[in-house]
Structures are given as structure tokens and as C-alpha cells.
């Protein structure tokens, strides 16, 4: 797997900061799933690691928690701050948190650790800042995500147009270093056409490729081939994600 260019990732999400919430269907669904896995926990202090524009920071704040919103992207943090999503804001990398040990009841990270170079280091970092009795709750993407995108692009060229994610076995092995639970669930979204499906990826900042990308614009003919090759259901273009979730207990 290619190393992640953190500055490029931050820039991609920064460009998407203003439109992120309107495109973030996947983030909302994965957050709902992770909340269900947490059950009746009521953390008094929460780290929202990879907070984006702050929708979940706001959720935890409204639930009565003291929230620290953390993101690699300054524009995303500014967006969160403009919404008064949290009480504290930190620009930092999840793999190297500049935070004290045992500070939070919950370290929450929804669809952010896939942008880390080392998942084990990211989870170790999150685990470190959680108090005994607390938890790390996270979601990420597993291999097998975006099969429709890969299939459609094969009708146009042989280049890579989406990042490859870690296998379920690798994710599970990493999480097994701690006490907790994990699972994987498919999430399928539907869009009016291929262009809307691809814009949903761009709109959440997720079009940055770790291996680099070609910036040649799509021609009309290429877009037509994409549309014809894209798997559809009832006339709508699908995007399927393999969503991996984990809840790690802090003993």
C-alpha cells in the first residue's frame, strides 16, 4: 500500500469543507451504526478524531459531553468551529495525538483512520488518550469497497481511480490487540447518474489517491461509457462500501 501524503489528504478535505455535509450520506449511516454498537454509554468527555465539519462533535456536545474536535484539515476545523460544534479544537494527526494520556471517556473516529499510514499506530494513539473504563469507537473502509466504481472505470481506462483499503482479516487482526468487538457491514448508496456518484466522493474529500492521480478531465464520451458500464438498480447508479466498525475497551 502506498504511504499516505497527509498534507495532500488535508488539502483535499479542506477543499471539500463547505460542501461536505451535503454529500456525507455514508458518514451519517456509519455514525448511526457505530452509535448503535456503543449502546447506552453516556461519555462525559469525547474526542472526535477526524471530526470533519463537526456534525458528530455537535451531536456529542448536545448530548452533554465536553468535546474536543480534532482534524488534520484546518478548513474542516474552522467549519466545525463556525458551527460551535465543540468546546475545544485541535489540528493534529491521529497517529501522533498531542493530547494527555487518559483524558477522554470516548475516542470517537468515524471514517477517518483509513487516511492513516498505520492503523495499529492510530488505534494505539486513540487508546492512549482514553481513561480506564472508556472506549475507542471507530469505523473505516475495508477492501471490497466501491466495486461499481472500479467496474465502470474498466470501460474507460486501466488506471486506479479509488484507493485500495485494508482487508477485513488485516483489520480484525489489528483490533484483536485489545479487548473489544468488531464487525463489517455493506452500505450501498444510490445516485441519479455516474457523475453524481463520483461527485459524492469528491464532495467528501475522498478523491485523493495515495499513489497519485491523473488530473485529465473526463470527455463526454468517457462519461457516457462510465454511465453505461456502471452497475445500476432501478435506473440509479450504486456505490457499495464495506464498512468495518470496532469498539475497543480501555481496561
UniProtKB/Swiss-Prot annotation:
Recorded catalytic activity of this chain's protein: malonyl-[ACP] + S-adenosyl-L-methionine = malonyl-[ACP] methyl ester + S-adenosyl-L-homocysteine
UniProt cross-references to SUPFAM superfamilies, sorted A to Z: S-adenosyl-L-methionine-dependent methyltransferases
Keywords assigned: Biotin biosynthesis, Methyltransferase, S-adenosyl-L-methionine, Transferase
EC number(s) stated in the UniProt entry for this protein: 2.1.1.197
Any one Gene Ontology BP term: methylation
This protein's pathway: Cofactor biosynthesis; biotin biosynthesis
Single GO molecular function: S-adenosylmethionine-dependent methyltransferase activity
Source taxon at top rank: Bacteria
Role description: Converts the free carboxyl group of a malonyl-thioester to its methyl ester by transfer of a methyl group from S-adenosyl-L-methionine (SAM). It allows to synthesize pimeloyl-ACP via the fatty acid synthetic pathway.
PANTHER family: TRANS-ACONITATE 2-METHYLTRANSFERASE, TRANS-ACONITATE 2-METHYLTRANSFERASE-RELATED
Assigned protein family: Belongs to the methyltransferase superfamily.
Name assigned to this protein: Malonyl-[acyl-carrier protein] O-methyltransferase
Gene: bioC
Amino acid at each position: 500500500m502506498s504511504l499516505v501524503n497527509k498534507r495532500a489528504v488535508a488539502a483535499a478535505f479542506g477543499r471539500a469543507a463547505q460542501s461536505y455535509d451535503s454529500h456525507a450520506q455514508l458518514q451519517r449511516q456509519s455514525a448511526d451504526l457505530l452509535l448503535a454498537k456503543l449502546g447506552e454509554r453516556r461519555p462525559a468527555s469525547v474526542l472526535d478524531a477526524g471530526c470533519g465539519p463537526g456534525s458528530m462533535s455537535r451531536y456529542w456536545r448536545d448530548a452533554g459531553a465536553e468535546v474536543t474536535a480534532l482534524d488534520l484539515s484546518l478548513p474542516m476545523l474552522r467549519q466545525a468551529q463556525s458551527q460551535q460544534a465543540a468546546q475545544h479544537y485541535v489540528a493534529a494527526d491521529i497517529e501522533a495525538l498531542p493530547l494527555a494520556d487518559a483524558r477522554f471517556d470516548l475516542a470517537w473516529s468515524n471514517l477517518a483512520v483509513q487516511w492513516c499510514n498505520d492503523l495499529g499506530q492510530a488505534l494505539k494513539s486513540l487508546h492512549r488518550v482514553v481513561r480506564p473504563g472508556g472506549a475507542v469507537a471507530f469505523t473505516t473502509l475495508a477492501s471490497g469497497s466501491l466495486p461499481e466504481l472500479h467496474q465502470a472505470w474498466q470501460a474507460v481506462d486501466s488506471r486506479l481511480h479509488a484507493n485500495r483499503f485494508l482487508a477485513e482479516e488485516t483489520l480484525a487482526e489489528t483490533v484483536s490487540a485489545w479487548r473489544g468487538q468488531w464487525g463489517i457491514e455493506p452500505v450501498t448508496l444510490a445516485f441519479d447518474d455516474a457523475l453524481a456518484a463520483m461527485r459524492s466522493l469528491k464532495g467528501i474529500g475522498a478523491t485523493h489517491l495515495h499513489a497519485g492521480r491523473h488530473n485529465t478531465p473526463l470527455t463526454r464520451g468517457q462519461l457516457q461509457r462510465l454511465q453505461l458500464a456502471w452497475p445500476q438498480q432501478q435506473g440509479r447508479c450504486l456505490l457499495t462500501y464495506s464498512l468495518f466498525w470496532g469498539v475497543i475497551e480501555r481496561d
